[in-house]
Regions:
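N-acyltransferase acceptor-side catalytic subdomain
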Residues: 1-158
Length: 158
């Protein structure tokens, strides 16, 4: 059984601008990072390329929220990355599952005929949503999840 970062600690980290990462999937060490700059998506002025928007409007996928958080974070852990690495180890996975059970971590999922083909997850504190990771098994499916998420955040006045 892996160690788990308590939910209260994770929330405190985010409030202080820190986020936890492992060096790789097998690491037993969690490092805290505090970047000088964080990427912020301005949801009220969110630019969607025309080609992507047309594809999104034509898609026949189903989107769900928090339907299968564990599969999303697991698929994010296994996603092919350019550097062949992941920052999601068993400690991160189990800790974020607990955060999800406390309704502080959420997933957006893209399904094609009931098969999970893309998704993202992140942490919600107050009026902020911190996107953590995404995966795509079909071209653009994770981008579609981001578009869906932005629409939800706008609707809920983030």
């Amino acid at each position: 059984m892996s160690k788990i970062i308590p939910v209260s600690n994770l929330l405190d980290f985010y409030k202080k601008g820190l986020f936890p990462m492992a060096d790789n999937a097998d690491s037993e060490i969690i490092n805290l990072y505090q970047p000088k700059k964080r990427f912020i998506i301005p949801i009220n002025n969110f630019h969607v390329p025309k080609k992507l928007f047309k594809l999104f409007k034509k898609n026949t996928f189903t989107f769900k929220i928090n339907n299968n958080f564990e599969s999303v974070i697991s698929k994010c852990q296994l996603a092919n990355r350019k550097d062949n690495g992941t920052w999601i180890n068993s400690i991160i996975l189990d800790s974020y599952l607990n955060l999800h059970y406390e309704k502080k971590a959420h997933s957006v999922e893209c399904y094609d005929q009931n098969q999970l083909i893309g998704g993202l997850y992140g942490v919600h504190i107050g009026g902020c949503f911190f996107g953590e990771s995404m995966f795509s098994e079909l071209s653009n499916s994770s981008k579609f999840c981001l578009l869906y998420l932005v629409a939800i955040l706008k609707k809920n006045s983030f």
